[in-house]
């Protein structure tokens, strides 16, 4: 279990999880508000 926690605390794993969460939030936001993500300024 200690080795598994050490593996989870490495930078590539944290980066992959963070990018997956961010992508999921953006996908869900774009699904409910399709015109707001790329709004012209």
UniProtKB/Swiss-Prot annotation:
Membrane-spanning ranges: 7-27
The UniProt record lists the keyword 4Fe-4S: no
Membrane topology per record: Single-pass membrane protein
Record's subcellular location: Cellular thylakoid membrane
Xref: InterPro entries: PSI_PsaJ (IPR002615), PSI_PsaJ_sf (IPR036062)
Magnesium among keywords: no
Gene3D superfamilies: Single helix bin
Similarity annotation: Belongs to the PsaJ family.
Function recorded in the entry: May help in the organization of the PsaE and PsaF subunits.
Name of this protein: Photosystem I reaction center subunit IX
Lineage: Bacteria, Bacillati, Cyanobacteriota, Cyanophyceae, Gomontiellales
Gene it is expressed from: psaJ
